[in-house]
């Protein structure tokens, strides 16, 4: 079925405004969106905040070669429920909620039945994806969205929407590998490779789990930030042979958040025997992994991609309990193109969040 932009759902469509890229220039400008009517199992959400993920930048510029234009990005959505379908029991109008990287799946395969909707072969992403009815999904750089209730997360009262929105991508991306690879047991020693949008959240979750945390970075200037502000226990400059040697075979696991191509052997050497390195960054080119680096010490190299819906709800509740939030810079909708330029230069600490509720309609009217 060819992708279409208009909703195929029965009933009256709901009009929204968004910011869309029309081509690989990536320039975002106002765009009228027709959302489907609120179905029996759906939740309609007024979007108040939406985080900017680095993948948004890749997609608007078609750097991954699968962009469908016009493209409305955004999969770190936080807002308020305005309407629910007749079968919805978990949510009601006025609830504070979020939507992350997925808005649908088959809901019946082994992965879905085991709570791993993120591994469903028929999974539908929040934007730049084709839903079951053939429509193209539009993301959270928009005034409202309609989502099946299974893919909506309830925000705890203690979690502010603006600093919580990025956790729906960055948070679950680092939380899941810690949980499923045994790196959430107090006293374990975890390394966080890279201190950016993912890395700074990984440090915070590691501290919430009671772990010893070492930040590994190529930027010596981030040492004070890591130790004094984020609370890491140690900092290793990856270009220092002396510091890397001192940290050799000391870590139970490493969460690798780096998207640049880096040699794996020096970082695998930081692991204890039976240690695990989990990749959550996506380098453009294949990685060089000398087999001896894994075989010697029985080390494991694994990957992890976001998380299922139950884990996402669990993550946001644990984050609220322990005060884990993203460090953000709130911007208006009219500043989004400048923010994208800055993001391309890594000029943000650590996540941009669009104040959709207060600024999108004004930006669209200009």
UniProtKB/Swiss-Prot annotation:
Residues binding Zn(2+) 1, per UniProt: 53, 75-76, 169
Example of a GO MF term: coniferyl-alcohol dehydrogenase activity
Catalysed reaction, written as an equation: (E)-cinnamyl alcohol + NADP(+) = (E)-cinnamaldehyde + NADPH + H(+); (E)-coniferol + NADP(+) = (E)-coniferaldehyde + NADPH + H(+); (E)-sinapyl alcohol + NADP(+) = (E)-sinapaldehyde + NADPH + H(+); (E)-4-coumaroyl alcohol + NADP(+) = (E)-4-coumaraldehyde + NADPH + H(+)
GO biological process, one term: lignin biosynthetic process
Cofactor: Zn(2+)
Top-level EC class: oxidoreductase
EC number: 1.1.1.195
Cofactor binding remark: Binds 2 Zn(2+) ions per subunit.
Positions that bind Zn(2+) 2: 106, 109, 112, 120
The keyword Zinc is assigned to this record: yes
One matching Pfam family: ADH_zinc_N
UniProt entry tagged with the keyword NADP: yes
Keywords on record: Lignin biosynthesis, Metal-binding, NADP, Oxidoreductase, Zinc
Pathway this chain belongs to: Aromatic compound metabolism; phenylpropanoid biosynthesis
Domain of life: Eukaryota
Chain sites annotated for binding NADP(+): 55, 173, 194-199, 217-222, 257, 281, 304-306
Functional summary from the UniProt entry: Involved in lignin biosynthesis. Catalyzes the final step specific for the production of lignin monomers. Catalyzes the NADPH-dependent reduction of coniferaldehyde, 5-hydroxyconiferaldehyde, sinapaldehyde, 4-coumaraldehyde and caffeyl aldehyde to their respective alcohols.
Annotated family: Belongs to the zinc-containing alcohol dehydrogenase family.
Oligomeric form and interacting partners: Homodimer.
Protein's name according to its UniProt entry: Probable cinnamyl alcohol dehydrogenase 3
Organism listed in the record: Oryza sativa subsp. japonica (Rice)
């Amino acid at each position: 079925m060819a992708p279409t932009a208009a909703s195929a759902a029965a009933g009256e469509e709901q009009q929204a405004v968004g910011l869309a890229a029309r081509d690989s220039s990536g320039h975002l400008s106002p765009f009228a969106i027709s959302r489907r009517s609120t179905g029996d199992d759906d939740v309609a959400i007024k979007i108040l905040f939406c985080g900017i993920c680095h993948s948004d930048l890749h997609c608007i510029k078609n750097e991954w070669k699968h962009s469908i234009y016009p493209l409305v990005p955004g999969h770190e959505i936080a807002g308020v429920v305005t309407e629910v379908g007749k079968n919805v029991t978990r949510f009601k109008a006025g609830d504070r909620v979020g939507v992350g990287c997925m808005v649908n799946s088959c809901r019946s395969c082994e992965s879905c039945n085991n709570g791993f909707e993120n591994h469903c072969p028929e999974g539908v992403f929040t934007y730049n994806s084709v839903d079951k009815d053939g429509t193209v999904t539009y993301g959270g750089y928009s005034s409202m969205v309609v989502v099946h209730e299974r893919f909506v997360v309830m925000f705890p009262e203690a979690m502010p929407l603006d600093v919580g929105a990025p956790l729906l991508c960055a948070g679950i991306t680092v939380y899941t590998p810690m949980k499923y690879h045994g790196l959430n047991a107090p006293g374990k020693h975890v390394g966080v490779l890279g201190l950016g949008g993912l890395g700074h959240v990984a440090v915070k979750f590691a501290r919430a789990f009671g772990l010893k945390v070492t930040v590994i970075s190529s930027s010596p200037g981030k040492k004070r930030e890591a130790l004094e502000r984020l609370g890491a226990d140690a900092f290793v400059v990856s270009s220092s042979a002396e510091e890397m040697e001192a940290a050799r075979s000391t870590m139970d696991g490493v969460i690798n958040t780096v998207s640049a191509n880096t040699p794996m052997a020096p970082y695998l050497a930081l692991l204890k025997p039976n240690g695990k390195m989990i990749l959550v960054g996506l380098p453009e080119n294949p990685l060089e992994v000398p087999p001896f680096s894994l075989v010697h010490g029985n080390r494991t190299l694994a990957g992890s991609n976001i998380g299922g819906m139950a884990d996402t709800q669990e993550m946001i509740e644990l984050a609220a309990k322990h005060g884990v939030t993203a460090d953000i810079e709130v911007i208006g909708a009219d500043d989004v193109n400048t923010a994208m330029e800055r993001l391309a230069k890594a000029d943000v600490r650590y996540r941009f969040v669009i104040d959709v509720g207060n600024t999108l309609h004004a930006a669209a009217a200009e």
